[in-house]
Amino acid sequence: RRSLPELDSNHIQPLKKEMPSELGSFNETRKRYEFYNGSTIQFQYLERDSDCDRIQGTEIHIALVDEAGQMTPYQLGYIKSRMRLGNYTPQQEGFLPRLVMTANPGGQSHNFLKALYIDPAPAESYFFDHTMRDPNNPADKGWLTMYIPAKMSDNKYIDPSYASSFSALPEELGRALREGDWDLVVG
């Protein structure tokens, strides 16, 4: 997310409400959930590109980026550059870093996301993210990637009247958001 209030209301507060206290506790100062087994869930917002400095040196195993279309291409690339798993054993190979992003059509990274994740292959088909390829290893094809489309109607938890609120938007954008159609709008 782009701001602490967005991060707090959409992710931190729901997690604090749902996470059983037997598993760990939330550290308000560090904005992270600390499990008693030593694992953590770190919450971070990136309002400006310069905020990426706060995650420099961070080893991220799993990154979950909500509303990726609102981030800049630089921020999304920087997050990807922090994805690593140091000193892992062959048994841990299946736990290599994972990046999951959610995004709606539109936003400042619309064209970036569409070109990198939506256009390269049919929906729900694996392909390689060539930007995550080791240039010194000709055998490395990049990260295995998949685009999973979604429509507003796929979310059974949304109030049925929510769709009507999109009538206040330009018609093409409202339709793109309802249908999850990345071809309807230009970022």
Which stretches of residues belong to each language-model region?
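Phosphate/NTP-binding elements of NTP-utilizing enzymes
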Residues: R1-G187
